């Protein structure tokens, strides 16, 4: 039920586990086991949730981040003033997660790409990040930190594009260009998903 789903997400540990399992399921759906690592550890002792082996054996770090508490308060707020307040808190939460990924997991000296993916397991949360934050460009902030935001619906397309580009270019020389191209693909995919959602709502009415 919806109630039990919300109750589950009130527990940060269970919420984190659900996000990690969602990421693992997405990776396993599209790639054979020898192409990815679950819980890849760095010399610092930190572990990224997943690392995808690209064609030239460079690792693409992917970490699941699920910012739920202030998002739920934002959704349930009863007026625009409260919504704006929780929206700012939600943005702050997301920014901290982006900074964490950028600092801990983008480690070219240890064989990673010089950018990473932040996997947002809930489409509604992802959509809020990309489309509905007033006066804030989350994607631009993430780009400057070399982090690309993806969701279950945009994950496969994003990684497929990255793999293709890795076959043809030296990634460290082209990172910003690739990130911008990828963001365009992801944004178009997210818009298409939203268009289908609106069409479904229209047809059901």
Model-assigned labels for residue ranges:
Residues 1-205:
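Amphipathic, heptad-repeat alpha-helical coiled-coil/stalk segments that mediate oligomerization
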């Amino acid at each position: 039920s919806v109630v039990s789903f919300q109750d589950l997400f009130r527990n940060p540990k269970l919420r984190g586990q659900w996000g990690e399992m969602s990421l693992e399921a997405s990776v396993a759906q599209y790639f054979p086991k020898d192409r990815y690592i679950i819980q890849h550890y760095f010399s610092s002792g930190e572990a990224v949730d997943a690392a995808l082996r690209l064609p030239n054996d460079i690792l693409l770090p992917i970490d699941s981040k699920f910012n739920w508490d202030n998002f739920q308060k934002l959704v349930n707020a009863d007026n625009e003033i409260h919504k704006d307040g929780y929206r700012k808190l939600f943005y702050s939460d997301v920014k901290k997660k982006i900074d964490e990924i950028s600092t801990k997991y983008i480690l070219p000296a240890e064989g990673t790409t010089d950018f990473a993916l932040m996997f947002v397991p809930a489409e509604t949360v992802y959509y809020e990040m990309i489309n509905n934050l007033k006066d804030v460009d989350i994607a631009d902030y993430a780009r400057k930190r070399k982090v690309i935001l993806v969701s279950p619906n945009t994950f496969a397309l994003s990684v497929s594009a990255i793999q293709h580009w890795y076959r043809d270019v030296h990634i460290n020389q082209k990172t910003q260009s690739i990130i911008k191209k990828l963001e365009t693909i992801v944004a178009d995919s997210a818009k298409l998903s939203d268009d289908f959602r609106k069409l479904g709502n229209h047809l059901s009415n």
